[in-house]
């Protein structure tokens, strides 16, 4: 059996546990045996969602070890884009991305950074050129002398390029340098930015992707099989921790981008024969007085509070949609996979319905699933958008089902409730993996739910018996050959053990409380533990330490 766990996104890369890299008929994390193709959509009752105003749970932000800068490199000059950038972020428009009960969440907009991006897509040249304007707020308790941005496409795993030019702070040109072979951009401020103050940062950027490169590079930054995926195509402001900017070298193992919630207002010019799939929702198309060049379509998107802004352009794909609890779910797939495409819609809809009932309501108006050429991994999540490996659509096994369920769960555990995906990936991956079990329970499919749990047991026990057990709560770069077994399988089993200790009603009350407390924010393992203990009124420290912070033998549930 191949255990596929991607090092670049969220789901199963094939070289971690076995030699060779041939995606199998398995799916999810870990992949399941081929056990049929049930598309049953009846669901069992879940605990009713409580709307209790929970008391605050103590939290602490993790410290990030400092990283010495590499020799700086001045970035090249880029011509400015002709696409207009709005002068002020329209906060009222952001409500279009949120379901009405969550529009009040925008009252907290002053604590989020604001991105305004206007860009032109050229699918032939494989480039995105644009201008980014940001409103950056110093939410720390010390002045900022500089700002740091991640240029993720310059990471070797992306296989692309992202360069910037004409960087200005409050309309004043400023010096910039790059570090870590161009992956990190330093923007020196003309004067320190005091705590609580804001600065306007503008820059031009140019992104370049490869074509048909999913076998050798990151499939989510690549044009292939009718999908031009443009993950992290823009400069992303780094997070600021208690001890400074997050300047850690990015590990290839696990999710690369570690980002904070922000508001995005994005205007894109695209050739008329390409269709856009993005985070958020479209609010304008070819508005009078703001028309694009001939042969292009100009569209404006707003995100609502989101952890990232994902962009893809598609050509020649079919689509199907349905509504679930007010959210429009849309799937995109190649025409020759119509039956599987329709099945993917049923899976995504059932996943959303089940997790809404058990975790708390998804606050956004749209969710999209795209069949894509990923090759090295089976699925990857972005806020509101999920990419699924194309070969799963040709399978009659459980792979498509578990992969989509896993990625939909990430909309809660990663996108809405964030964590340090490079430093403590187990927190979102463990919950997303255990959600595969919960998904099958929502179908009343006890056989498949038990099979998922058994896969987690098999993977973890195989590693433990081989002497490869270890601490789960550690940076991705610290794992050596046991990332799958610990971050996915052992972590999923921890949440199963937690559920057994708490009981179903209290377990789901804990997850709802965790979601309510940290929605749009970031949590640590300690935050999660404190929330669980506050919900059950019990001491869970020993259970947590045994499974997560140490490598002592545990009773596998």
Where do the PLM segments sit?
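Post-HExxH zinc-binding segment in Zn-dependent metallohydrolases
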Residues: 385-386, 390-391, 424-468, 540-542
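N-terminal, polar/Ser/Thr-rich
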Residues: 23-34, 46-49, 54-129
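Extended, low-hydrophobicity, Ser/Thr/Pro/Gly-biased non-transmembrane segments
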Residues: 204-311
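Juxtacatalytic substrate-recognition/specificity segment
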Residues: 266, 297-300, 317-411, 415-424, ...
């Amino acid at each position: 059996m191949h255990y596929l766990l991607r090092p670049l996104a969220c789901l199963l890369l094939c070289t971690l546990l076995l030699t060779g890299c041939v995606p199998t008929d398995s799916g999810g994390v870990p992949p399941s045996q081929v056990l049929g193709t049930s598309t049953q959509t009846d669901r069992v009752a879940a605990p009713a969602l409580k709307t209790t105003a929970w008391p605050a749970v103590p939290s602490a932000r993790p410290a990030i070890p400092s990283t010495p800068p590499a020799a700086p490199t001045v970035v090249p000059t880029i011509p400015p884009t002709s696409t207009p950038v709005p002068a002020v972020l329209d906060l009222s428009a952001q409500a279009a991305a949120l379901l009405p009960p969550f529009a009040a969440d925008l009252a907290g907009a002053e604590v989020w950074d604001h991105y305004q991006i206007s860009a032109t897509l050229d699918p032939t040249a494989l480039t995105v050129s644009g201008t980014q304007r940001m409103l950056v707020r110093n939410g720390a308790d010390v002045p900022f002398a500089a700002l740091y941005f991640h240029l993720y496409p310059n990471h070797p795993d992306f296989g692309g390029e992202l360069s910037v030019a004409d960087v200005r702070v409050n309309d004043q040109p400023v010096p910039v340098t790059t570090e870590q072979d161009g992956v990190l951009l330093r923007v020196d401020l003309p004067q320190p930015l005091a705590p609580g103050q804001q600065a306007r940062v503008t820059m031009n950027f140019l992104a370049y992707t490869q074509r048909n490169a999913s076998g050798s590079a990151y499939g989510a930054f690549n044009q292939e099989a009718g999908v031009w995926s443009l993950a992290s195509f823009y400069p992303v402001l780094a997070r600021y921790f208690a001890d400074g900017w997050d300047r850690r070298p990015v590990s290839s193992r696990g999710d690369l981008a570690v980002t904070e919630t922000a508001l995005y207002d994005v205007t894109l010019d695209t050739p008329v024969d390409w269709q856009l799939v993005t985070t958020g929702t479209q609010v304008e198309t070819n508005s009078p007085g703001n028309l694009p060049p001939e042969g292009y379509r100009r569209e404006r998107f707003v995100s609502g509070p989101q952890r990232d802004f994902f962009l893809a352009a598609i050509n020649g794909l079919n689509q199907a949609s349905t509504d679930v609890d007010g959210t429009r779910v849309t799937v995109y797939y190649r025409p020759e996979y119509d039956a599987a495409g329709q099945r993917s819609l049923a899976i995504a809809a059932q996943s959303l319905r089940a997790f809404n009932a058990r975790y708390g309501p998804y606050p956004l108006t749209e969710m999209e699933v795209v069949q894509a050429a990923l090759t090295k991994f089976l699925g990857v999540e972005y806020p509101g958008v999920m990419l699924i490996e194309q070969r799963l659509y040709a399978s009659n096994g459980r792979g498509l089902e578990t992969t989509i369920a896993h990625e939909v769960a990430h909309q809660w555990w990663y996108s809405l409730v964030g964590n340090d995906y490079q430093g403590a990936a187990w927190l979102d991956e463990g919950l997303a993996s255990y959600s595969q079990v919960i998904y099958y329970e929502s179908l009343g499919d006890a056989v498949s739910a038990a099979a998922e749990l058994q896969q987690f047991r098999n993977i973890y026990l195989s590693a433990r018996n081989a002497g490869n057990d270890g601490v789960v709560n550690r940076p991705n770069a610290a794992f050596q050959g046991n990332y799958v077994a610990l971050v996915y399988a052992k972590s999923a089993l921890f949440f199963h053990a937690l559920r057994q200790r708490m009981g179903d009603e209290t377990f789901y009350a804990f997850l709802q409380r965790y979601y309510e407390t940290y929605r749009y924010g970031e949590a640590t393992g300690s935050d999660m533990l404190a929330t669980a203990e506050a919900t059950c009124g019990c001491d869970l420290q020993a259970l947590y330490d045994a499974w997560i912070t140490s490598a002592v033998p545990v009773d596998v549930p």
